[in-house]
Amino acid sequence: MLMICGMYQLFGNAFITVEGERLPGIGILDVTTQGNAKRMIGPVVLRTAYGDVVGYENHSGSTQLAPGQQSFGMVRSGKGNNGSDGTEGAVTGNVFGSYLHGPLLPANPRFADALIKLAVERALGEPFRPAQIDDEIADQARTRQVRRLVRR
């Protein structure tokens, strides 16, 4: 399951509004989000288990991972979960939470393939061996984006 932005926050323990009201989440991801008046907006590059992942963030929530909660990736460029600890997103089992909008899956075929593999293997209970697909154009576009953003 891939949870983006508000769903990522909802899958956490709680969202604390700008006014200080604590709204409970469903607690699948061990994260807590504090709403802010200022938004974190812009392109992002992450280092992940699936290689470099590119996307676009646009969120006002500042998310803190609890000790032991695995992040989706480490920020190479951008703000990530909170603009300070270098993490982005959270992963528990087959649940991925992230602030990365934009063409996340088409721009990152290794990650997209991994999500499909998880879903198919869970549904069928057997290994998934997809046919080879030519991802060269997506790989070239992602590589250019990484080089452009990380050089700053």
What are these regions (language model features)?
Residues 45-93:
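Catalytic beta-strand/loop cores that center a nucleophilic Ser/Cys/Thr
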Residues 1-50:
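Cysteine-nucleophile active-site neighborhood
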Residues 39-42, 55, 97-100:
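Short, flexible active-site loops
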Residues 2, 27, 56, 96-98:
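Hydrophobic/aromatic beta-strand patches that form the interior of the parallel beta-sheet core
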Residues 5, 59, 101:
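Histidine-centered divalent metal-coordination motifs
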Residues 33-36, 62-65, 103-107:
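Short, acidic Gly/Pro/Ser/Thr-rich loop/turn segments
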Residues 94-152:
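Acyltransferase
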